[in-house]
Amino acid sequence: MPRVKGGTVTRARRKKVLKLAKGYRGSKHRLFKVAKDQVMKGRQYAFRDRKATKRNFRKLWIARINAAARMNGLSYSKLMHGLKLANIDVNRKMLADLAVNDAAAFAALAEQAKTALAA
């Protein structure tokens, strides 16, 4: 019985990798060996950066909340502590959105935080 080399399977696998490497520069989208390494590295970057995106957005929200809080006479930490004391459960994403799009509502929350801190 002759040896089976699996040509169609190999071709399909290589075609799949080269399709994933579309748009890469130079030989990284042409040659299978180089493309395979680059696709693997690209997927590592994608995995890492999915985690980093969450951190980056949290940092952005905190920076926006801090800027708006200081315009209302509070620091970020005082605002968050005051909101916790006032039993106002608003997450940072929503607070940052209020700070950017609805300054009056954010100012009202800041006032409630101030009264809770004073009490």
From Swiss-Prot:
GO terms for cellular component: ribonucleoprotein complex; ribosome. One of its GO terms (molecular function) is structural constituent of ribosome. Keywords: Ribonucleoprotein, Ribosomal protein, RNA-binding, rRNA-binding. Signal peptide: none annotated. GO terms for biological process: ribosomal large subunit assembly; translation. The keyword Ribosomal protein applies. It comes from the Bacteria. Transmembrane segments: none annotated. NCBIfam families: rplT_bact. Belongs to the bacterial ribosomal protein bL20 family. Binds directly to 23S ribosomal RNA and is necessary for the in vitro assembly process of the 50S ribosomal subunit. It is not involved in the protein synthesizing functions of that subunit. This is Large ribosomal subunit protein bL20. It comes from Levilactobacillus brevis (strain ATCC 367 / BCRC 12310 / CIP 105137 / JCM 1170 / LMG 11437 / NCIMB 947 / NCTC 947) (Lactobacillus brevis).
